[in-house]
Amino acid sequence: MAAPSAGSWSTFQHKELMAADRGRRILGVCGMHPHHQETLKKNRVVLAKQLLLSELLEHLLEKDIITLEMRELIQAKVGSFSQNVELLNLLPKRGPQAFDAFCEALRETKQGHLEDMLLTTLSGLQHVLPPLSCDYDLSLPFPVCESCPLYKKLRLSTDTVEHSLDNKDGPVCLQVKPCTPEFYQTHFQLAYRLQSRPRGLALVLSNVHFTGEKELEFRSGGDVDHSTLVTLFKLLGYDVHVLCDQTAQEMQEKLQNFAQLPAHRVTDSCIVALLSHGVEGAIYGVDGKLLQLQEVFQLFDNANCPSLQNKPKMFFIQACRGDETDRGVDQQDGKNHAGSPGCEESDAGKEKLPKMRLPTRSDMICGYACLKGTAAMRNTKRGSWYIEALAQVFSERACDMHVADMLVKVNALIKDREGYAPGTEFHRCKEMSEYCSTLCRHLYLFPGHPPT
């Protein structure tokens, strides 16, 4: 099945909506949702009078909602009212994430009363729109978990909105900052070799449409994750292979075929991303049958994949590892890489050196969207929380940070994120990502080096 293009994911998500409502609800690739545009319009005068821009603009600049040129254009206006009007003119053109980022910036600059005003207006607007067909809920921008049963999902309120901590506009707007020659020269000797062109092969396996007795629901927003990762890995210099909607047996067979590709011999690393429903230790095929993750890792270990021996192998798993929704807890007030320890040595047999041996599994790092026993959260419009955070951090920090440290930053973003869906079990829900590693050196991706 061909991957949906980044420019068509929005149309794909909304094709089942009622015809009378279609014009208002379909998103442009880099356009603001009509609900959000109308919310800003209805509060335009109050915002123009009350916005405090000095710190707010810096937050929006940091989130890539505005550019340096836009900030200068705004500040060139005479008077705070005119400056506020200029910002309000720009915001609707700054992508589907601009509204959420604006609300977050209001909160961060102690203008939460304006955020509350916007969210109240937004909730009222959504009540006015015609209800969706009972068979489809593809337009609802609320968080759902990766193991949420279909009957439960259909009961969710149509006026739910999720705050996003992601600051990008999606795959079309992703840009990876290049590594500088100076950084490469000071770090490459202690890191894994990553110089090949391409850097390696990457596989993105995305299951979205499910059949079988399990009655697993359509992974709305899964196509966004798919497009995001394909774009990200290409920008990082990988040759990307795509698989969509595979049964458990097909996943096993095609992962094995991928692991045995001759190109691994002449490239320096490998990436495997698995996006599906799941349980602890396994992911679902579209037929409702499970593929054990240990079987996946085994396909790429030193015994079964000699072409990748001593080369870093990255795995990213976007799937539930249980069905418990993390409700979170209230926060209380307050707030080397080691060398080998050596091995036992015998005085006998010094004449003949033994062949170097490797542990069966090494040089792997695996990022999980959630902890054991818990559900992974996915926004039905913007995709999974984890993939959003992964794309944000890797695009911004691959230039000067190794993969393990980047995954720590991903953890921090996920930790701070909170579901916003009043009236549902997902309101104020939490998620915590994690990673495990058998890497033996720092893994820098060195994007853009050496220059072509």
UniProtKB/Swiss-Prot annotation:
Belongs to the peptidase C14A family. Expressed at higher levels in the embryonic lung, liver and kidney than in the heart and brain. In adults, higher level expression is seen in the placenta, lung, kidney, and pancreas than in the heart, brain, liver and skeletal muscle. The active site is at 277, 320. GO terms for cellular component: cytoplasm; cytosol; endopeptidase complex; nucleolus; nucleus. Residues 327-336 have a biased composition (Basic and acidic residues). This is Caspase-2. The CARD domain mediates a direct interaction with CRADD. PROSITE patterns: CARD, CASPASE_CYS, CASPASE_HIS, CASPASE_P10, CASPASE_P20. It comes from Homo sapiens (Human). It catalyses: Strict requirement for an Asp residue at P1, with 316-Asp being essential for proteolytic activity and has a preferred cleavage sequence of Val-Asp-Val-Ala-Asp-|-. Changing residue 99 to A: Loss of interaction with CRADD. Gene3D superfamilies: 3.40.50.1460, Caspase-like (3.30.70.1470), Death Domain, Fas (1.10.533.10). It comes from the Eukaryota. Residues 2-169, 326-333 form a propeptide. One of its GO terms (biological process) is ectopic germ cell programmed cell death. The modification N-acetylalanine is found at residue 2. The mature protease can process its own propeptide, but not that of other caspases. The gene is CASP2.
